């Protein structure tokens, strides 16, 4: 507790103990010790007896004086750190640290020593090692000091960052499995700036500060984890961290990260949920501006584009462009804006392969995607439009057409074999579901059972699909619709994929009251957890069981229905309609 006081020539408890051990008159010895080590103010001596009269212990008085002086000293240290020339103030702080460092383990004076170190841009290495070696001191020191320790100790920095990265991934996954189902409030609803205010991003931003070396370390951790897990949320964090530093005008880092301006432009697109022509040209300029010998930057750009928020924006923009092309009667290959969106999508989707192979080349786009798949997708839009127009015609002008209920075999094959085709196809499914287009949805569902990399059963797609299906709530009363959706799609994967099981239960928790009773009973049996099911599935299933019980209690029993007397009410007379 009194460590370091002797080094400064200040008497401590050990000195008092020694004095009392060797003295013959203890009271005189104590009085002398108090005189020598008390507050040496002549005016104070006459005032102390008043404190005694009020029963104020000397310890309380001295502690109060000590706290006041320590606060003044902390203010003075902060003032020194901001006064005069840099060289002079750092010299003063170094001298102060040299004199006070021996007190660093004394709890009452530790804040002063830590404050001095905090304001030094370069703490002597010897002292940093002493701090690092002592867990208590390391925990107590300011982040400014820790940065100096971390930049030469990647493993220690990794230990600090790792729990934050785990927390971030858990938060993202938790958001995808949110019990709230809504087309308006979903995973992609928060604006980029709002997302950057999250705890993990803010903590990482503070830990990095203006230190380029630490920033590079975080990026390396994110690349490594992305390669190890294929988890795209690490790509989101990479973009969010850079933009968080951008918000704080940390030019030391923003000017050296070659992805800064590209990310800034893309961030604006994500905010608007659309890539307009002007920004599309800017993004193209960054890609075209990658010089020979600097191709490695494509790895980072692809990671920025692999961020689900970027993929979502690019995919939504692609669907919008395709609709415009239909109305303009233009082919996909004749639209430079569409081709650029596809180029950006391809780079984002190829991020893992690009970084893993270390072959930094833009992935080749399949010609058939543009010449066959997209025109085929546009033909589905035309089928839909034609049918809707026909339904609005007077009865005598209507053609006897039924809505097409099959997909071209080649269309399904594209969804299975090409990632780009699959991504665009899935976003078209989301688009028609949001449009409450039941016919188009039922036509496309069989094609989603087998898709490239099971993308139709990915958490992001299922999160968006279940949210959009809320708009078709009335259709769940129809057994045919439920059979197509559940038996024909969801239940083909739920036994082997726990995430699908969870998403189906989320959907039923929200819409159970709308589902046809016979179908609901069958679904409850089909979705019963097995011994291998995780806690999340069991919990959701239990909640569904409770909801269904409440639903049963609300319904009148057959006997109650029979006992309820019918009310014989006279029919009101209705006037005959006037002849037209």
Swiss-Prot record:
Self-association and partners: The NELF complex is composed of NELFA, NELFB, NELFCD and NELFE; the N-terminus of NELFB binds to the NELFA:NELFCD subcomplex. Binds RNA which may help to stabilize the NELF complex on nucleic acid Interacts with the first BRCT repeat of BRCA1. Interacts with KIAA1191. Isoform 1 and isoform 2 interact with NELFA, NELFCD and NELFE.
Name of the protein in its database record: Negative elongation factor B
UniProt KW Amino-acid biosynthesis keyword: no
List of residues that carry N6-acetyllysine: 519
GO MF term list: RNA binding
Assigned protein family: Belongs to the NELF-B family.
Organism name: Mus musculus
Location, primary (coarse class): nucleus
Modified residues annotated as Phosphoserine in this record: 557
Role, per record: Essential component of the NELF complex, a complex that negatively regulates the elongation of transcription by RNA polymerase II (Pol II). The NELF complex, which acts via an association with the DSIF complex and causes transcriptional pausing, is counteracted by the P-TEFb kinase complex. May be able to induce chromatin unfolding. Essential for early embryogenesis; plays an important role in maintaining the undifferentiated state of embryonic stem cells (ESCs) by preventing unscheduled expression of developmental genes.
GO biological process: cell population proliferation; negative regulation of stem cell differentiation; negative regulation of transcription elongation by RNA polymerase II; stem cell differentiation
Subcellular localization, as worded in the UniProt entry: Nucleus
Record's keyword annotation contains Oxidoreductase: no
Phenotype when the gene is knocked out: Mice exhibit early embryonic lethality. Knockdown in embryonic stem cells (ESCs) leads to proliferation defects, increased differentiation, increased expression of development-associated genes and the dysregulation of genes involved in signaling and metabolic pathways. Mice exhibit cardiomyopathy, impaired response to cardiac stress and the reduced expression of metabolism-related genes in cardiomyocytes.
Keyword annotations of the record: Acetylation, Nucleus, Phosphoprotein, Repressor, RNA-binding, Transcription, Transcription regulation
Region (Disordered) location: 552-580
Matches recorded under Pfam families: COBRA1 (PF06209)
Disulfide cross-links: none
Domain of life: Eukaryota
């Amino acid at each position: 507790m009194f460590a370091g006081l002797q080094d400064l020539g200040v008497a401590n408890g050990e000195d008092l103990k020694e004095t009392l051990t060797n003295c013959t008159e203890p009271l005189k010895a104590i009085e002398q010790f108090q005189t020598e080590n008390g507050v040496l103010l002549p005016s104070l001596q006459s005032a102390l007896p008043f404190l005694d009269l009020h029963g104020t212990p000397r310890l309380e008085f001295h502690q109060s004086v000590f706290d006041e002086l320590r606060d003044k000293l902390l203010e003075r240290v902060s003032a020194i750190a901001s006064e005069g020339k840099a060289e002079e103030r750092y010299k003063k702080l170094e001298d102060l640290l040299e004199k006070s460092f021996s007190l660093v383990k004394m709890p009452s004076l530790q804040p002063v020593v830590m404050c001095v170190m905090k304001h030094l841009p370069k703490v002597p290495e010897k002292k940093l090692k002493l701090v690092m070696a002592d867990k208590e001191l390391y925990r107590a020191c300011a982040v400014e000091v820790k940065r100096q320790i971390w930049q030469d100790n990647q493993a220690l920095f990794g230990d600090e960052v790792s729990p934050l990265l785990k927390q971030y991934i858990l938060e993202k996954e938790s958001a995808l499995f949110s019990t709230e189902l809504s087309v308006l409030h979903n995973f992609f609803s928060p604006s980029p700036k709002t997302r950057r205010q999250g705890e993990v991003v803010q903590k990482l931003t503070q830990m990095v500060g203006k230190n380029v070396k630490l920033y590079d370390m975080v990026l390396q951790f994110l690349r490594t984890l992305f390669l190890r897990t294929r988890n795209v949320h690490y790509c989101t964090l990479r973009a969010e961290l850079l933009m968080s530093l951008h918000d704080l005008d940390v030019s030391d880092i923003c000017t050296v990260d070659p992805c800064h301006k590209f990310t800034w432009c893309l961030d604006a697109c994500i905010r608007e949920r659309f890539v307009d022509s002007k920004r599309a040209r800017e993004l193209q300029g960054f890609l075209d501006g990658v010089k020979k010998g600097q191709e490695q930057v494509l790895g980072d750009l692809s990671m920025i584009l692999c961020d689900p928020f970027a993929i979502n924006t690019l995919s939504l923009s692609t669907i919008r462009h395709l609709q415009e092309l239909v109305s303009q009667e233009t082919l996909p290959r004749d639209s430079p804006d569409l081709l650029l969106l596809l180029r950006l999508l391809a780079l984002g989707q190829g991020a893992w392969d690009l970084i893993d192979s270390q072959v930094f080349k833009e992935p080749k786009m399949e010609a058939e995607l543009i010449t066959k798949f997209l025109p085929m997708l546009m033909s589905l839009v035309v089928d839909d439009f034609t049918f809707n127009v026909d339904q609005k015609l007077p009865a005598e002008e209507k053609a006897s057409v039924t809505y097409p209920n099959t997909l071209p075999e080649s269309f399904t094959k594209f969804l299975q074999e090409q990632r780009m085709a699959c991504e665009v196809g899935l976003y078209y499914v989301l688009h028609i579901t949001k449009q409450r287009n039941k016919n188009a949805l039922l036509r496309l569902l069989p094609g989603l059972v087998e898709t490239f990399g099971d993308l139709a059963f990915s958490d992001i797609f299922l999160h968006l699909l279940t949210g959009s299906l809320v708009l078709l709530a009335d259709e769940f009363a129809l057994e045919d619709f439920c059979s197509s959706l559940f038996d024909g799609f969801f239940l083909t994967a739920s036994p082997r994929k726990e995430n699908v099981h969870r998403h189906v239960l989320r959907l039923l928790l929200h819409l159970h009251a709308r589902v046809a009773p016979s179908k609901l009973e069958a679904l409850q049996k089909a979705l019963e957890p097995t011994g291998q099911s995780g806690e999340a599935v069991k919990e959701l299933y239990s909640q569904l069981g409770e909801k269904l019980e409440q639903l049963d209690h609300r319904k009148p029993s057959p006997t109650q229905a029979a006992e309820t007397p019918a009310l014989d009410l006279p029919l009101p007379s209705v006037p005959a309609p006037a002849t037209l």
